[in-house]
Amino acid sequence: MKNVLIIGSTGQIGSELTMKLRSIYNGNIVAGYIPGAEPKGELAESGPSAIVDITNEQQIAETVSKYHIDTIYNLAALLSAVAEAKPQLAWKIGMGGLFNVLEVARTMKCAVFTPSSIGVFGNNTPKDKTPQDTIRNPRTMYGVTKVSGELLSDYYNIRFGVDTRSVRFPGLISYVTPPGGGTTDYAVDIYYSAAKGEKFVCPIGKGTYMDMMYMPDALRAAIEIMEADPSKFVHRNSFNIAAMSFDPDIIFNKIK
């Protein structure tokens, strides 16, 4: 990677990934954002930024051309809880936006990273040591867009040779950006509430274990998969990754 565009650079992953990439690479690491979600502070001052609405294919193409982009990190998405409240918008961004990114990548020869999620799995998916190739039958719009995104990314790789890559993130734990509406965000939100002395009502039941990962490990995965030798890939879209698993009661007892 030399010149990188991060679409959704001010979100939970993007705000930290952009800074990490800038600390590693000397090329253009462009923070793509939409009006109302502008980069601030060090994120704004440490490198170039551009308005990039993922629903606008021409805008993506113009930015790729201007900064000679060779790799796109497509991080634009509505998180799970928000996607359930706004399913039409979730599909427009998650799938319509991905289609735009892949079309630009096809015509302008870019590699693309689009994160997937454990949200692709459903009630019939094996819960322990979940296989790489297994049942994917989500019951949420977020999960549906992620499964569809994996399939579309694989299609563009097989049909057009677009270098698409992905990992299935578990819940991500970070203090840099406040929780944004993900099902697993309780694991961060609970600490904000505790620090403020506020009551916290957990949306996840006691005994419900979910896979989690610290953000630095997630950034490492997102970068290393794009640096990996593609000739050695068994899968492209998408690899299972995990770090730890816990339920809300474990966090509660630690805070208490």
Model-derived features: positions:
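Mid/C-terminal beta-alpha module of Rossmann-like enzyme folds, strongest
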Residues: 221-256
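N-terminal Rossmann NAD(P)H-binding glycine-rich loop of SDR-like oxidoreductase domains
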Residues: 3-24
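Conserved Rossmann-fold NAD(P)-dependent oxidoreductase catalytic core, especially the SDR/UDP-sugar
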Residues: 74, 99-141
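NAD(P)-dependent short-chain dehydrogenase/reductase
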Residues: 154-209, 215-219, 224
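Rossmann-fold cofactor-recognition segment
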Residues: 44-56
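NAD(P)H-binding glycine-rich loop region in Rossmannoid oxidoreductase-like domains
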Residues: 54-93
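Conserved glycine-rich Rossmann-like NAD(P)H-binding loop of the short-chain dehydrogenase/reductase
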Residues: 25-38
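Active-site helix of classical SDR
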Residues: 141, 145-148
